[in-house]
A protein has these predicted regions:
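N-terminal glycine-rich anion-binding loop in soluble enzyme alpha/beta folds
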Residues: 8-103
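Short, solvent-exposed amphipathic alpha-helices that sit
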Residues: 83-91, 146-154, 213-228
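Long, hydrophobic, well-ordered secondary-structure blocks that form the structural core
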Residues: 105-179
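Alpha-helix N-cap and loop-to-helix initiation/capping positions
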Residues: 79, 143-146, 172-175, 179, ...
Length: 271
């Protein structure tokens, strides 16, 4: 039952990629199966890919990934989820005294708390307007596009669909560029200015770029805007891409190749 006559509520859904429930083989298998089964992430024929995924990748990768997650896991659990919850609390505190009709939830594309669960909470709070904010500054079909798919898949089952605004990018927003620049300056104050700053973005297959994905261009522009904002020269800043998966060519230059084939520490690189 909906309340009538009261001021309509605005729901804000903050989303991110996600995290396993625990840093062990069992939970990583569940998480990776959901993540790597997303057709936005892996653009290969479904039947062929599912055979590879189920018979090869999910037999090997969960154990290796679990060990990596154990290295970053804290007493509060997943760092990504902990950060997301702290961000949520600060945002809620900021708005609570200004507008009690705005409510917030966090939803992860993969793992928990899920986007469907977060939207259900907002539905129960009777939101009539919905703002979706994926925490991806640069639009990419594999991240922002996938989030849009999940949100709309849920909303299309609702009887009363709220008015929705979906923020699909903010890679060139002034406040974002200033925040990045201030973060770098703050680090310099604690250490020293390096000879070169490496902006390392998560990579995607080069094929996605040639098929029209703007992600690569948006990453380059973010780097350029930070460079201009901080008054740096071309020699003082560089864009690279990390986390290559499989044998296919991904966006270059690879961060790993830069660090492993050069004396990065001796040359004063800061990633």
């Amino acid at each position: 039952d909906y309340e009538h006559g009261s001021k309509e509520k605005i729901g804000v859904l903050i989303t991110n990629l996600g995290t396993p429930d625990a840093p062990n083989k069992k939970e990583l298998k569940v998480y990776l199966n959901q993540f790597l089964s997303d057709p936005r992430v892996i653009e290969l024929p479904k039947i062929l890919w599912q055979i590879i995924l189920k018979l090869v990748i999910l037999q090997i990768r969960p154990s290796k990934s679990a060990e990596a997650y154990k290295q970053i896991w804290t007493d509060k659990g997943s760092p990504l989820l902990d950060i997301a919850n702290r961000q949520l609390n600060k945002i809620q505190s900021s708005f609570s005294s200004k507008n009690e009709n705005i409510v917030f939830e966090v939803g992860m594309r993969y793992g928990n708390p899920s986007i469907p669960d977060a939207l259900l909470k907002l539905q129960k709070k009777q939101v009539r307007r919905l703002l979706v904010l994926p925490m991806y500054p640069q639009y990419c079909a594999a991240t922002t596009g996938s989030t849009f798919d999940e949100v709309t898949n849920v909303l299309q089952k609702w009887r009363w669909i709220p008015e929705m605004r979906f923020i699909n990018q903010y890679f060139e927003e002034k406040n974002y560029i200033e925040a990045l620049s201030n973060s770098i300056k703050s680090f310099w104050e604690k250490t020293s200015k390096p000879q070169k700053i490496i902006f390392s973005y998560h990579g995607i297959p080069k094929r996605y770029l040639t098929n029209g994905d703007p992600y690569h261009c948006f990453c380059l522009k973010t780097t350029r805007l930070v460079k201009e904002h901080m008054g740096l020269s071309d020699d003082e800043i560089m864009t690279t891409f990390q986390s290559r998966f499989g044998r296919e060519e991904w966006l270059k230059p690879y961060t790993s190749c830069l660090l492993y084939t050069s004396d990065a520490a001796d040359e004063g690189f800061c990633v």
